[in-house]
Amino acid sequence: MLSYQDKVGAFYKDNARANSSKLSLVTEEQGGRRPPYLLFVLLILLVGIMALLAITGVRFHQVSTSNMEFSRLLKEDMEKSEAVHHQVIDVLTPLFKIIGDEVGLRLPQKLNEIKQFILQKTNFFNPNREFDFRDLHWCINPPSKIKVNFTNYCDTIGIRKSIASAANPILLSAHTGGRGDIFPPYRCSGATTSVGRVFPLSVSLSMSLISRTSEIINMLTAISDGVYGKTYLLVPDYIEGEFDTQKIRVFEIGFIKRWLNDMPLLQTTNYMVLPENSKAKVCTIAVGELTLASLCVDESTILLYHDSNGSQDGILVVTLGIFGATPMDQVEEVIPVAHPSVEKIHITNHRGFIKDSIATWMVPALVSEKQEEQKSCLESACQRKSYPMCNQTSWEPFGGGQLPSYGRLTLPLDPSIDLQLNISFTYGPVILNGNGMDYYESPLLGSGWLTIPPKNGTVLGLINKAGRGDQFTVIPHVLTFAPRESSGNCYLPIQTSQIMDKDVLTESNLVVLPTQNFRYVIATYDISRGDHAIVYYVYDPIRTISYTHPFRLTTKGRPDFLRIECFVWDDDLWCHQFYRFETDSTNSTTSVENLVRIRFSCSRSKP
């Protein structure tokens, strides 16, 4: 064990206080070496402080620059906001005011313009006012007409699309109820009654001409999908300086619009006039796709030359768009291109239609090919039974012993190609009436209805199916029969040996209605009653029924022309009729044009 002294010595050995005197000496010795180190430390501190000051200065400069940039951007944003504010105040607010004025003020003004238009029309028909052809501009361009600016258009296709877009709202109202059935339903067990009414044409160009002393001859009308077209010869009471003829050929086209009480209104939107001596004595008509097309000739019979020896006569082609001042308005003479077998064609009052930018008409054609087949058909039919046509030695319209065939005239209206009239032919039922062959659109794809009107009270007329495609065929449908004595494709029209009704002075053309089910209409000028009347006959071959309705006339006379064109409007039958007659009292010729409506109803229906 350690002694007390050892413990004390150990304590002082390990304890600082045991060597305090030595430590004090060492400390004093080290204190003499402090100044160099302190200077070095102070130098480092000074450098650090200067670096911090430099960094602080740089950061301060950056912050100042950022503040200046932020102030500049803020100022720009405030300027833009101020500009937007002024834009709203100076531009949008007046624009909203203009829109409000258009809606609140222009609409009543538009109604007032329509009112003024009606008043102007009333004044226009004032007999005391001298007629001026140029005054018709306001009549066919009323304030409600859609204006289209064609200045910047060079492409005809673009123009057609613009016109179609502008016309669609008008056509949509006309399509409603345009394909419905006009007859009472099958469940009708009671009597079927018909109610008819006559309406004048108010804003049609031809109606304004008839109201004057001017005379209209041979009017043709075609109606298709809410658009109508007309062509006629006008004999005015005076002649303007630009015409050196006594007759003027007029073409007009327009919309069928809804008017008061939803009745159809024929409103002219475009027209064209030509002197008769410009090969416009005889003209056809076709309407469709917002366009009118017509073929005009001096003489009805056209001789076709297929070599360079003969001088081929041209055919005048007239096209008219629904609106004026467009490339669709054309007058051009074309040389027809025909099959070598076609020797002649005969153009009279023909109604066609336009589909897929192709205008199509049907006409009688004289063909040298396969004449023996047609003659053998007639000879075999006449071997055992004598039909009235068996004794004929001359056939309309060309005369002589050659039977006419069916000719088809097609006129492509594609703006990318030049106008060209193509003539093709085919055979079908024997043709007994050489004047007036009409072509109506059919719901069936690639075909149409070809009609030939009755004649002299002995020929009932006929209706055939005619193809529109490359394979041109004519197939009998109604008013024809196949003789038992003949074989093959041999059909004859129905013909009587004597006039069936001597009270019928004239008959109209046959009209096929644009309905889903096959219906057709014909009208006659009848004098069997105390008052003369135009009697309508409406046929439904599927149900083997027909309806009649007479429209009594306030005048009496001898008619020389009767033409109708019918359409369906809100499930009622509407017909445009034009007829000329010589009055018994004054021996003067009078032309009448109007619209008639026939409404069929059932008195009692099955539950």
From Swiss-Prot:
Residues 59-607 are virion surface. Keywords: Glycoprotein, Hemagglutinin, Host cell membrane, Host membrane, Host-virus interaction, Membrane, Signal-anchor, Transmembrane, Transmembrane helix, Viral attachment to host cell, Viral envelope protein, Virion, Virus entry into host cell. Glycans are attached at residues 149, 309, 391, 422, 456, 587. It is found in: Virion membrane; Host cell membrane. Residues 1-37 are intravirion. Its main location: virion. One of its GO terms (molecular function) is host cell surface receptor binding. It comes from the Viruses. It is a single-pass type II membrane protein. One of its GO terms (biological process) is symbiont entry into host cell. GO terms for cellular component: host cell plasma membrane; membrane; viral envelope; virion membrane. SUPFAM superfamilies: Sialidases. The keyword Heme does not apply. The chain crosses the membrane at residues 38-58. Belongs to the paramyxoviruses hemagglutinin-neuraminidase family. Non-sialidase subfamily. Attaches the virus to cell receptors and thereby initiating infection. Binding of H protein to the receptor induces a conformational change that allows the F protein to trigger virion/cell membranes fusion. The cellular receptor might be SLAM, and may explain the lymphotropism of the virus. Binds canine SLAMF1 at the cell surface. This is Hemagglutinin glycoprotein. It comes from Canine distemper virus (strain A92-6) (CDV). The lineage of its organism: Viruses, Riboviria, Orthornavirae, Negarnaviricota, Haploviricotina.
